[in-house]
Amino acid sequence: FDTVFVETVGVGQSETAVHSMVDFFLLIQLAGTGDELQGIKRGIMEMADGIIINKADGDNVDKAQMAAAQFRNALHLFPPTESGWSPKVLTYSGYYNIGVKEIWDMVDEYMAFTKKNGYFEYKRREQAKYWMYESINDTLRDTFYNNPAVSSMLNQTEQQVLGNEITPFIAAKRMMDLFLENISNTKLP
């Protein structure tokens, strides 16, 4: 595919995962909702390569322009991006189809900028490395919890921790020791 869009629910966790798999991270905000700069709290703005204020039409045009100005000002509070790119803030109206060309131009400009300075390839390599380790971690976690010896002792060990009979650290060590003793009985997922 030449272009793939990945939409998230906007609560913070999924954006971190998505950021590690995309070339361009676009934050879409609505004006006039009272939480224009809420993205700062979640750290999402720091990940954004571009920000668009949606529904910049009708009675909302002035609010959208004000929100765009607030975001531009807020971006100055963040350290420079790793790519060297300065994120842009644009307004957009899907209803009137205003701003689409400017958004695509921004994405194209970003891609050209990051390919020229080598960041595009660097980020792709870092993403590949990140997903390799994520896959290893997922496999290790699944292998651990699917181990018959571990699954048979986990609840009992948890109860010992909850009853203050052993510390969480001793419990973890015991469970890891049990896992390592019985790893040959476990199949990879």
Tell where the protein language model's regions lie, with residue ranges.
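A general structural signal for short secondary-structure boundary/capping elements
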Residues: 52, 75, 136-140
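Phosphate/Mg2+-binding loops and adjacent switch elements
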Residues: 1-66, 70
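Canonical P-loop GTPase G-domain recognition
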Residues: 50, 56-116
